[in-house]
Swiss-Prot record:
GO terms for molecular function: 23S rRNA (adenine(1618)-N(6))-methyltransferase activity. It comes from Pseudomonas aeruginosa (strain ATCC 15692 / DSM 22644 / CIP 104116 / JCM 14847 / LMG 12228 / 1C / PRS 101 / PAO1). Residues 1-24 are annotated as: Disordered. Pfam families: Methyltransf_10. The gene is rlmF. This is Ribosomal RNA large subunit methyltransferase F.
Length: 336
């Protein structure tokens, strides 16, 4: 019999703000079906105060088992695993970024979403979980380059791909050798990407990340001074959680570097966790000469999020890009 537990914001997320209409995780989780596909999940299942099956989202082991079950059931990803302490992302929210990104491409292509291997995406900071390339290739058939500065993250991602040959054929992993750079050293001279995506480090230091974790646990009523706390709800290593100057500095650096690749990328995009960082980023992009800057709002349960997208291509350049790279793609009308 699952044991009862206190509520968690993610546990009832589906009764709050909706996910993207194409998100596979609309509706409530079917735990019996998840357990049938991944029996190891059963020992982590609990009853929430509403009498429904859930897991303790503050338990990294439970979240990892839950993610493994979701990835196997919905995305045909086998033997997914990450080292202890690495970021274990919430799958529905990561999928939403990709679906809204597909909408952005569709809005740039007469309402038709381009699918298939002709489109290439660069995932900056792919992490040990390799989550965006896995979901993006499954949902839209895009090819990905997953980049990271951490060798252990890339080794973990490589192990996932080795267990999933179908994905490995479409996903290339690259190491960024210089942690001070983002696009430099990753994008080749004649290389083109239809989109970039990124989940930037949120904090400015390990101490700040730990304080943020303690605040979240206190709000959940779970703060136990004798317990070793995972960083945030889903773990995470240094480069995944913090960088010098925090999110604002990272976004500023990304904006500056993007200018050098203005004609090699159609849409640059990045998540922005702190809404207060939006005005400076938008102003900087205008100064750098971006021809189109968009803020795409998203919502997963009680959490509000957004990503910023920008391009330096003018209308003529965009038409030429679409004609050269997207006309042969499989096309899907927006809203389907």
């Amino acid at each position: 019999m699952p044991r009862p537990t206190s509520p968690h914001p993610d546990a009832e997320r589906k009764s709050a703000s909706p996910l993207h209409p194409r998100n596979r995780h609309l509706g409530r989780y079917d735990f019996p079906r998840l357990i049938a596909g991944s029996p190891e999940l059963e020992r982590f299942v609990i009853l929430n105060p509403y009498g429904r099956q859930s897991i303790d989202f503050a338990d990294p082991a439970a979240v990892k088992a839950f993610n493994r079950a979701l990835l196997q059931q919905f995305y045909d990803v086998r033997e997914w695993d990450i080292p202890d302490g690495y970021l274990c992302p919430p799958i529905p929210g990561r999928a939403d970024y990709l679906h809204y990104l597909a909408d952005l491409l569709g809005a740039s292509h007469d309402g038709l979403i381009p699918r298939g291997p002709g489109l290439r995406a660069l995932d900056v900071g792919t992490g040990a979980n390799c989550i965006y390339p896995l979901l993006g290739h499954h949902e839209y058939g895009w090819r990905f380059v997953g980049a990271d500065i951490d060798p252990q993250s890339l080794a973990s991602a490589a192990a996932i791909l080795a267990a999933n040959p179908r994905f490995a054929a479409a996903i290339e992993l690259r190491r960024q050798p210089d942690r001070r750079q983002i696009f430099q050293g990753l994008i080749g001279v004649d290389e083109r990407f239809d989109m970039t995506l990124c989940n930037p480090p949120f904090h400015a230091s390990l101490d700040e990340a730990t304080r943020g974790s303690r605040r979240k646990w206190k709000n959940l009523g779970k703060l136990d001074p004798t317990r070793t706390l995972p960083l945030l709800n889903f773990g995470g290593q240094g480069a995944e959680l913090y960088c010098e100057g925090g999110e604002a500095a990272f976004l500023a650096g990304m904006a500056e570097e993007s200018r050098a690749f203005a004609t090699q990328v159609f849409w640059f995009t990045t998540l922005v966790s702190k809404a207060s960082n939006l005005p400076n980023l938008q102003e900087r992009l205008k100064t750098l000469g971006a021809s189109d800057i968009r803020v795409v709002d998203m919502a997963q349960g009680q959490k509000q999020s957004r990503f910023v997208a920008w391009t330096y291509l003018d209308k003529k350049q965009r038409r030429a890009w679409r004609k050269e790279r997207w006309t042969a793609a499989l096309l899907e009308p927006l809203g389907e």
